[in-house]
């Protein structure tokens, strides 16, 4: 049973890669449904803003409490802002946003397309001379690619603001000390890394969620299984991709805190 499931998963994942190249080949000739694209952009962007901000705020509160407490014990208050902002910019904001979108949007995309596949609506698109890649896949992938970096930046901004507030109110760390430490440690490349990671994650979420929906079978039960498997696969792939990107992006760089303090 496990072997059969593994074989099916490998087939689906390989078909996701093929879908990626099929879409690349069709980019120049693709027929974009503007209304559909705008609708998907709204679903991914403004439709996910509340949960993104809520998650960013509470995660930043907890993270700031843990970091500030330990660094104050080490008499390193001047490094608190740098550590928190670097962590959110390079890792936490893009990854947490991707996790939220995977759970909220990825599952929705898979369930929608899987239901269409089960009820033979995909076949109806072919009869209407409409390519499912143009009508279904491209708007969903494009909306993720456009909105996930924006959501990550919004999440990052909210996280920094909440961390600044918590550090000042709960631990009496002056805002000037926090911000000076943060801005001395940050560089433009850190923001670019945040955006680059978000773009990679957006592609993963878009293609896996769509392909898992297109390959769904087994009626209502199959829709549920495909949705669950889609989210698990997206998260698994996002975490592996994050590790690989971080390894190559930061392996040769020095300490940002040391550079900020001219050590």
Curated annotation (Swiss-Prot):
Q: Which residues form a coiled coil?
A: none
The intrachain disulfides are none
Q: Which GO terms describe its cellular component?
A: ATP-binding cassette (ABC) transporter complex; chloroplast membrane
User: What is the superkingdom listed in this entry's lineage?
Assistant: Eukaryota
Q: Which InterPro entries match?
A: ABC_MlaE_roteobac (IPR003453), Permease_MalE (IPR030802)
- MF terms (GO), sorted A to Z: phospholipid transporter activity
Topology of this chain in the membrane? Multi-pass membrane protein
Q: Which UniProt keywords apply?
A: Chloroplast, Membrane, Plastid, Transmembrane, Transmembrane helix, Transport
Q: Does the keyword Phosphoprotein apply?
A: no
Q: Which residues cross the membrane?
A: 43-63, 70-89, 150-170, 188-208, 230-250
Q: Where in the cell is it found?
A: Plastid, Chloroplast membrane
> Pfam families, alphabetically?
MlaE
- Indicate the principal place this protein occupies in or around the cell: plastid
Name the job this protein performs.
Answer: Could be part of an ABC transporter complex.
User: What family is it from?
Assistant: Belongs to the MlaE permease family.
Annotated protein name in UniProt: Probable ABC transporter permease protein ycf63
């Amino acid at each position: 049973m496990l072997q059969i499931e593994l074989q099916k998963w490998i087939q689906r994942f390989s078909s996701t890669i093929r879908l990626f190249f099929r879409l690349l080949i069709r980019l120049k000739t693709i027929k974009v449904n503007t209304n559909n694209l705008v609708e998907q952009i709204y679903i991914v962007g403004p439709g996910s803003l509340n949960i993104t901000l809520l998650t960013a705020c509470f995660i930043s509160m907890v993270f700031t409490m843990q970091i500030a407490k330990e660094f104050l014990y080490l008499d390193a208050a001047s490094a608190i802002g740098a550590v928190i902002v670097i962590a959110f910019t390079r890792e936490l904001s893009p990854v947490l946003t991707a996790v939220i979108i995977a759970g909220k949007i990825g599952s929705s995309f898979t369930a929608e397309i899987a239901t269409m596949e089960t009820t033979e609506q995909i076949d109806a698109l072919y009869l209407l001379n409409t390519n499912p890649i143009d009508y279904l896949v491209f708007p969903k992938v494009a909306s993720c690619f456009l909105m996930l970096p924006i959501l990550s930046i919004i999440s990052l901004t909210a996280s920094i603001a909440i961390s600044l507030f918590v550090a000042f109110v709960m631990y009496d760390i002056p805002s000037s000390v926090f911000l000076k430490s943060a801005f001395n440690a940050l560089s433009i490349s850190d923001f670019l890394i945040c955006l680059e990671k978000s773009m990679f994650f957006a592609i993963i979420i878009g293609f896996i969620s769509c392909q898992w929906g297109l390959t769904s079978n087994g009626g209502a039960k199959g829709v549920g299984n495909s949705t669950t498997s889609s989210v698990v696969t997206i998260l698994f792939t996002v975490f592996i991709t994050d590790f690989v990107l971080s390894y190559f992006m930061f392996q040769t760089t020095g300490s940002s805190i040391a550079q900020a303090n001219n050590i």
